[in-house]
Structure formats: structure tokens, C-alpha cells
């Protein structure tokens, strides 16, 4: 039983719902049901319960935050919607995500305790219900207050949390106590769990009060050392309750919906019909009974024609989807997400395509970029970061719409091919897996696939939760399995290795004591200057010298808190004193590459935009690479500007220094751009800063070895820029003496090319242009000579009469010449069958003779291929005589 003092002292009684069997607390003696859907209908539509007047979402948000500030909470800024600090999920799905796993595990203290926040969040669990149910959103703000209770520090727990909720709704918002129900439940998410109260008012869940004290391990609940108050008050839900509009979309997006309706020519629906439809939709699950059946049931309950209801509701659903999804996508892009086929980009593209799909099915049309721009104008006051990203958002939305149009053009052929493949496998039509494959591989929405299939005489059922299932496959990050040269158990008892490479990155040699030798080749020292592989930087190499011997260090890896050296040759004995010597030339080159990587990523961001995020990196010799999120290949001018900016930073000889900072302090000072290189799992993080404190050039959390100043890099040269995946661009670059060697090699090749072209290096461009003109003229002449030669050969073909047809077989391994000969010969002789054999292939041309019988005969002698009515080609390894005889039989 979950209880609280405020409930008992305020006249609440515990009851059990006869329908769902849940326990709940209410002041009303006549309340029978739990107050949640589907047990009760909405009772606030057209009849809001609050006395307080709330003007806007901003007003409601401010009331909430001020209420908790008055109650000794610290207001903190909202976090981004992309969870850069986590390695398990892409998007923030609730305010508690901001503090998982570091704060909830006890590894890092919270930024304040207790605290209050209003956190933009994204959940695609119910994406298929958005627009239909009247209440579901993909993007929403979760207002929350959190308290973190430690074994030695109690803040507050169930009693105080419940009292805050009661007082906020009754005193701050003026909702009568009798309207509020507290329903007992259990919550689980993000690896944690706990009992909870769901706060319900007139059938609508407006808040959840979670008392988190479990960690979920292998399906079991394990007590956490912390007891965490995790609350969630739905900003949009509460605002809807206070406004009493037919749907949450009308309350939250009212001004935008009015503009969108006017632009698209969609009439405003009857409020009474939409209100009743919303009430009934809220009490049923279309995924269970089917969407079309749900329309029929609701139409009957309202007393209207089902067809009329669909005609009224569906355009509104499309607008609701547009309003919700466009805000969510704008949040994502403003936070650095590029629509693509992977990761968070996949989810952004999915939402954009759902907008386009719904608008198309509703029969309304306008450039999506225009509809987005209208919404951005509405959002700019609440979310200034979205307005700042307006140019990028509109560019990406326009690109996505053009791609979608191309997808629609290619859909008929792709769906037809998929249907043929399904039939070959013994199935009559397409199943859910086929629809997923068509969407993931070619971007074809299932509704479009169903339309095409229907036009071909096949009915295809689209699952009502199709997009939710797609999203569920992409919301979590894939964790790469970690490999280790040594089992953790073999070094767990050893003390932490002193990491001299952090104390002095320029240390070339050092003395140390051997703590353990494992399997004759893994050496653990008490301290080391050898850098272990990590963060895209390769491990150091070198030697360990000891009395009576020397071992070559070929690899270095971190295993927990210990650094393990992989050696070749006889290892030093345990307890021995050794002298470690780092391959300094290699290490120094890698330091230049690593510091150069930081300079380059910041230069890329400054030229291409703040949406640039590192998607991977590898520092190596003689070249390194960095992969970044970007929607197109940068122009030559942009690459030149990036390179120039990077080398200006090198010339400025900016100071480079690392400092250890508490995680919260670093995040508060620099933001989550710290994690360009990925998540850093530590209470304290090593922050690498380039440039002075008053104007740093770049700041990142980084565990690599670096230079003292950018001047030591010498030169940064971009060697290649390529698009390696949808939404990912790779920069290959080099630094220092390797960059000089690369430039010198380019100079040598330029001089050699100039010599071949017949000019000096300064005249190379003009010389190449002349050569290109000559080559073009020679190519024109060659094509003309080939046509004349083909025509001559066509006239002199030796063909034999086979029945009423003429057959000619020619040995020729030149496809282009064969095509020209065939074109000339078959255009003047419709009864000609012309076959070219060579290079393990056979090609058949005819003037008008059907090749089907010929192909059938050829397959009997080893031909593997096919074609059209008058053309066939494929593999043929046999002899010419056998081929001739097969064709003669076919023509006889």
C-alpha cells in the first residue's frame, strides 16, 4: 500500500477500482472508479475544473517553477533533447534522463538538491496515436521536481512529494480537492524503478510521482543506495486540462493550427464533434480494435455518418501530426540531429515522413518548408535556440521533402518487385516484415506500399502501430562489446596505475616497478608513461628495459583502473625495476594529430554550423580522420575556409591545457558540447581547452595526450573529404611533417603532370585544358569512325538462312561496337537474329523476332541470362557451334 500523510489528513480514502483492480485515493465517497482511462471518460472537455486563469504554456511553466522555488527548490536550466551524456539512448524521454546514470547511481552529485526543471522530452512509443487520440504527443515538456536522498542526507520522500502535488494543483491552480485522484501504480524506466502515484483529474493523468529506490538488474529489483523523488508534471496535459479544448493540440498549438488551416484550406471542425470524438478515442485502443472500426464505433456513439466523420476528422489529424511532429523535429535539428538512416537521424526522418504521409492522405498540399517556417515563428519566443537554427531546419526539411517525392516516384516498381518476391516464396501479399524492409531500404511508407499493392490487385494490411515499432528499433544506442587483453579478475586486486602520461605528456622515459606479469606477455607496472589506446588515439609503443633484458611494447590497453602493457620477447620478472622508453617520434606525431583533431572539429563547426557533431575519429600516422554529422558534402570553398581557419589557430600558437573538473561544474560552464568525442564515464572529467579562458577556441572532455600549444602542430592539411554514410561526412587530414611530406608529394606530382602535358607547373591548368580539348575531339572522331566501321560490318555480315529467319553469329568482345553493329543491321533486316559471343558472355539482337524461344533453347546449353522481346544477354561459357545449333532448333 502506498500512502501519504497529506492524503489521510485531507480526507482521502483508499478504494479499489472494480474495472482495472487498481487502488486509488479520493475524497469523494461516491467515486467508484479509479479516475483513469479507459475506466472513466474525460470530464474536462468544454468544462475545465480550475478557478485559476493561465494565459499560456509559458505562464503555467513559470507558475510551476516559482511554486517550487518558494518551497526551497533550485531552478535549473533545461537540458538538450539529445542525450549526449549517455551511451544507451539517443533522446531525452523524461527529466530523470538528465540525471541517469551518473546521479542516480550515486557517482556524481546532482546540480542541486532538491531541484525543479521543465525538460523538453521526446517519446515515440505512441507515435501512431499522435493526431488520433487527442492526447498523445511525441514532443512535450516534463515539469518536474527531484530530490536525491542519500544514506547520510535525507531531503524528502513520499509525504512531502504528495503534499507538493496536492498544494500545487489546489492552491496554485485552484482545482477543487474533490477533483483530484491519486492512483497507486509501479513505474520502471532507464534501468530504475519504484512505486508511484498517478495524479488524475477528470479522467486525465496530469502528473506522476515516482519514488525510485530500485535498480533493475536481470529482471530483478535491487535496492539503490539512493532514494530518488522522480516526478513528472505534463506541461501540455495540464494546460489542456485548464483550457478544456477538444484536443491537447488545440490547446498547445492553437494559433499555429489556425494559420495552417487557412494556408491549406482546411475548415475548422465542429468543436462539439471533435470534443466527443476525443472523449471516445481516449477510452479505446485503435491498435486493439483497429482504426477503421474505431471510427465506426465513434460515429455510432456520436450519431453521425462514419464517412462524414472520417472526412471531418482526418484532415484535422494530419494538421495535429504536423503541429506536433514539426515542433519535435525542430527541437532535434536545433540540437544537432541530421535526418538520416541511422541513430537519432532515423527518428527525425521518420517524423518528417509521417507529416508528409498524413498530409498526402488527407489530400492537403503545401511546401513543407513553408509550414515549418510558420511554426518556427510561433516557437521562437519559447525556444530561441530553434529560431537560431531556422536556416538549417528549413534547408533539411526541404531536402527531406524532395527525397520523399523521389521515393513516391520509385514506389510502384519497388512494391511490384517486392510482391513478385513474396509470391515466389509462396505468400499472397506483403507482411509487416516486407513493409519494414521497404521503408528501411527505400523509404517507402507502408500506406503507399498498400496503395500500390491494391492497384495491382493485392490487399495489404498496415499495422496500426507500424511507426512505433520502427522507432522502438532505433531509440537505443548500440553498445559495442568491449574487448580486453586480460580478464578484469586477474588485475582487480592491483592498485590503480599512476598515469605519468597525464602528468607530463612530453615524458619520454620513466622508471617503474613490475607489479604483475600475466601469461608471459602482459605486464602491469606501478606507473607508466605509455598511453593506452582510447578515444580514437592508438596506444604508444616502445621498450621496457630491465637488468638482463629488454621487451618490446607493442600495445597498451586499459583494464579497469590498471594499464596493461603487451610485450614481445622475454618479459621483465615481477618485482623488477624497469626503464620504459616511449617511441617519442610516433607519440609526438600522434599528439599533433590529436590536438589537430580538436582544432579541426572546431573549425568545421565554425564554417558549417553548430549542428556539427563528431560521429567518429581515428588518430593515426601519417593520416587521421574525423567523421562529422552533416547533410551534404561541403563545397571546395567551405573546405578551403575550414583549412584556413584551422591553420590560423595553429599560427596563433594558442595555449593548450588540461584540467580536472567536477562533472556538474564542467557541464554548467561549457555545456554538452564537451562530449564531442563521446561519453566520459566519471565523477570528474578531464577538460582539454585550446585558447585562453576569456576566449577559448575549443573545449572538450578528452583523455588523450596533447601538445602545449597549437603552434607545435606546424600545419594542418585536409587531404580528402567524402560522404561515408547518409548524414555523415569524413575529413581525412594530416599534420606536422606528415602534412609537409604530403604537400611536397602534391608538388612533385604537379611538376610531373606539367611535364607530361608539355608545360611548366605554373601553366599546368592551361596545359591540361588543351589536352582535354584534344581528347574530346579525338573521342568524337573515334565515335564517328566506330559508327562507320559498324555500318560496314553490318553490311557484310555473313548470315545463314534458317527457315524464314537469317542467323549470324559473330565472335566479338566489345559491347559498344556490338551494339552499333546490331543497331545498323537489325534496322534494315527485321528477320535477322544477330548473336555476339565473347568474354564468357552471349548477346542476342533481333530486328523483330521474339527472343523468348531462343533464350529457352540457349538455357538448355548453359546460357544464364534474360532480356526483353528483341534482346537478351547473359553468361555463356560453351562453344559457338553448340550455341548455333540451339538457336537453329529454336528458329526451325
Swiss-Prot record:
Q: Where does Zn(2+) bind?
A: 594, 598, 702, 706
Per the record, the domain of life is Archaea
Q: What class of enzyme is it?
A: ligase
Q: What's a single GO CC term here? A: cytoplasm
Q: Does the keyword Aminoacyl-tRNA synthetase apply?
A: yes
**What's its catalytic activity?**
tRNA(Ala) + L-alanine + ATP = L-alanyl-tRNA(Ala) + AMP + diphosphate
Keyword S-adenosyl-L-methionine assigned? no
Q: What is known of its domains?
A: Consists of three domains; the N-terminal catalytic domain, the editing domain and the C-terminal C-Ala domain. The editing domain removes incorrectly charged amino acids, while the C-Ala domain, along with tRNA(Ala), serves as a bridge to cooperatively bring together the editing and aminoacylation centers thus stimulating deacylation of misacylated tRNAs.
What is the protein's name according to its record?
Alanine--tRNA ligase
| The organism of origin for this protein | Pyrobaculum neutrophilum (strain DSM 2338 / JCM 9278 / NBRC 100436 / V24Sta) (Thermoproteus neutrophilus)
The UniProt gene name for this protein comes to alaS
